[in-house]
Swiss-Prot record:
Residues 48-55, 118-136, 209-239, 298-372 are cytoplasmic. Receptor for lysophosphatidic acid (LPA), a mediator of diverse cellular activities. Disulfide bonds join 94-175. This is Lysophosphatidic acid receptor 5.
Amino acid sequence: MLANSSSTNSSVLPCPDYRPTHRLHLVVYSLVLAAGLPLNALALWVFLRALRVHSVVSVYMCNLAASDLLFTLSLPVRLSYYALHHWPFPDLLCQTTGAIFQMNMYGSCIFLMLINVDRYAAIVHPLRLRHLRRPRVARLLCLGVWALILVFAVPAARVHRPSRCRYRDLEVRLCFESFSDELWKGRLLPLVLLAEALGFLLPLAAVVYSSGRVFWTLARPDATQSQRRRKTVRLLLANLVIFLLCFVPYNSTLAVYGLLRSKLVAASVPARDRVRGVLMVMVLLAGANCVLDPLVYYFSAEGFRNTLRGLGTPHRARTSATNGTRAALAQSERSAVTTDATRPDAASQGLLRPSDSHSLSSFTQCPQDSAL
């Protein structure tokens, strides 16, 4: 561990050798930053500026992209720490960066859950839950999610204070690691378990249940098969893959590690260190979700995909097409008023497609109406 300058303190313990882990994190997070920053910045631009029609699903996707972008913007600070092997910045920046990771992970879980629940309401209960599938309701839910994760960010920031250790003749600071046993026995384990219950287990249960019900409904012989519904299946499968690949391994390992560190489950020091080594790999999978989410937008949201394809067309053709689309949208909104009551199945088709007349009458919102 290298440091700029600090006085030697004999009461400070020697620094653990985290350099192999730091090198791994340096490589993986560099790739996540290189891919995640442009992808999420582009996704947020498409949702807020390019798309003129927002479905309920797009509101959730827009907020998910904002959460991912916030995390990728914090990665340069992490990379500096992993390159230097010590924390050279103010303590507050360590606390903020650690809290942002928690906000992104649990916020992503909840936003993915809201996308799945919206598809469940649209396909399984298109009429009974119709009143919940409005842009205003979606915006309020997203505001509630941001408020919730900000509330949890306060205690998360408090426990992420840098720890001090001794490297050769210098006292240095570590961030994101080396939490003391006293901290684990105190407020850290209850905080971790509460965050996992509300931010991971509840969304996971909702995603599994809603996906299962939607798949069961669409598999019935009398179910209407359409391209839109196939896209819904792809969207739900993608959300399940992200949960199983990114969030389940990390949160499961974190719970086990917390029980070991708090001494609620007896284990030897080598066994505990092995679990920590696994956790350091799983945390990289959790951070990689911000790269996978934009792929979900592209392959499941037709309006998003068409907008990206349109970026390569000449400006005049793009403007002409946009004007024609807006004229068609205005006509569709007028006709949808008379046909809305006779199309219950259309409630399942809100996946960012501007040409759907039902989605126009029920789920249209301006970019200024984003829940950010």
